[in-house]
Amino acid sequence: MAVSSSFASEMATDTNGQVYKKVAWRLVPFLCLCYLAAYLDRVNVGFAKLQMLSDLSFSNTVYGLGAGIFFLGYVIFEVPSNILLHKVGAKWWIARIMISWGLIGAAMAFVQTPTQFYVLRFLLGVAEAGFIPGVLLYLTYWFPSAWRGRIIALFLAAIPMSNIIGGPLSGWILKSLGGVAGLAGWQWLFIVETVPSIVLGFAILLFLDNSVD
């Protein structure tokens, strides 16, 4: 979303909100799609659990540790990630977040040992760290304080939408794709649900601008 100096001037003098409405229509639906992709990558391990544990002979303890270690990586790197977002530029860093978590999430399809499971879940947390705070920070670049409450509320509406879509989609993949190309349903789940993250990550480089300045 390249911004010209004249457009920036329009935003500065926008008295009836028409320019901000245009920006909202351009940014918010796209960022909601990005959040949906983030949600799918974060929770698909829960949908994959039964098939994955059966195929790999993992115990519930192994699964629980692997599922939880995601948040360790996420918490440790959340603040550094947002510092780097500010230094590197929003579109570059958010794109990096999405592409890297997509690739790591896809690699989950080829896990064979508990150690591989732990490492990839931790790295997934590291990769995804800072995404939501980073997007919220990015939105503050485009909207004044009077607009931020409603814009952030619209973005966060992606949370229930993700819950509505994520479960049925994951169930369909597990049921319909199991055995295709010799891969189990849980493997296809990790592969299919990470493709949108990678595609959207590259789309960010074309679609977003670092700031209004």
Question: Which residues does each predicted region cover?
Answer:
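Conserved MFS/SLC helix-loop-helix module at the cytosolic interface between two early adjacent transmembrane helices
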Residues: 76-115
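Symmetry-related core transmembrane helices of the 12-TM Major Facilitator Superfamily/SLC fold
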Residues: 185-206
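Extracytoplasmic
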Residues: 26-60, 76, 166, 170
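Cytoplasmic helix-loop-helix junction between adjacent transmembrane helices
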Residues: 120-157
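Helix-breaking motifs and short loop linkers at transmembrane-helix boundaries and internal kinks
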Residues: 57, 89, 110-116, 127, ...
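Residue-level signature of mid-helix packing/kink "hotspots" within the transmembrane helices
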Residues: 43, 71-79, 129, 163-164
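Cytosolic juxtamembrane N-terminal segment immediately preceding the first transmembrane helix
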Residues: 2-43
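Glycine-rich segments within core transmembrane alpha-helices of 12-TM secondary carriers
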Residues: 149-175, 197
